[in-house]
């Protein structure tokens, strides 16, 4: 799904909605005899089966909605009532009835005969160019049906004008662009924005035609139903695309990681060795120039490009960002809990300054033997307001911190230990 030549393109064939989902519309009244043959050559278009989003290098239509010409060729090749009925039965899903053409045959005759002369201003030439484009597609089917080509071109332009003037057009456009943005490379996303900036020109192109044809058609429930179903279809398609990209991108990254681990276990060399942990800007520019030089080239063993292309780099960067976002969302609560626990322990480990000053004063006054008795500890508990466990821990940590800085206390402790050991050995001898 890529974006090419400054227009939104997407090859979508939506086969979800078939003819069996919607009951056939009521049959239109028979047309007058003088126009029956004329309108059989241009059967009513079916919205969902023929409104395909396709790319065209020579056509810059914004929505790329085209009416297929295969059904027109089939219907025009035979003038029998049975073939016309078969073509109408094949296009039952959301097909537009041609009864409004029969009810307004005088207006239609003037519109078809004069082209789109009623449209004034600069939009006249643009719509006529659109009609010429539509007519050019039908010339290769055998030719000779100029009136039918004019009707089809008029219907194409008018259908687009109705879509652009519909209240759900903005939602339809947003859903379509959202589908395009999912798998479009990062370096091509600005093209979509540039095309969206030109949407006002497309609206202005068909606004005059919509105003001219406003009196021909009243409330169109079929168009409302089509727009509603199509917006829902695009939203569902967007969710499927997102799931596809996330799942398969995760699988691809995990597969690459497993391959790297296997290579590291076989060779004993990590992927970062020999290339440096980081690269400067000059090295980045050199790599980009090398990539431009060797893009599309195969190495000696035929394992593909020597250096990843720009599209591959953008895809890897996109996957990396998606994984980073997923990891943050998955482990956000745990990370917050761990951080709060660490901060709480830090706050709990630090005693207030006034209490530590009292303990340090007692430590300095008893530096030769910094081991408080139970009476000293009880008095310190009353003076500082701390718990007995906190005072014991503070003295233990303080003795560890000053173990080598107070040789007198260590000497006294060693002598006391020796004397205690001598007394115990003497008792054992005389026992």
Curated annotation (Swiss-Prot):
The keyword Nucleus applies. Residues 343-406 bind DNA. Residues 15-47, 402-431 are annotated as: Disordered. The keyword Nucleus applies. One of its GO terms (cellular component) is cytosol. Keywords: DNA-binding, Homeobox, Nucleus. May form heterodimeric complex with the TALE/BELL proteins. Interacts with OFP1, OFP2, OFP4, OFP12 and OFP14. Interacts with KNATM-B. Belongs to the TALE/KNOX homeobox family. This is Homeobox protein knotted-1-like 3. It comes from Arabidopsis thaliana (Mouse-ear cress). The lineage of its organism: Eukaryota, Viridiplantae, Streptophyta, Embryophyta, Tracheophyta. The gene is KNAT3.
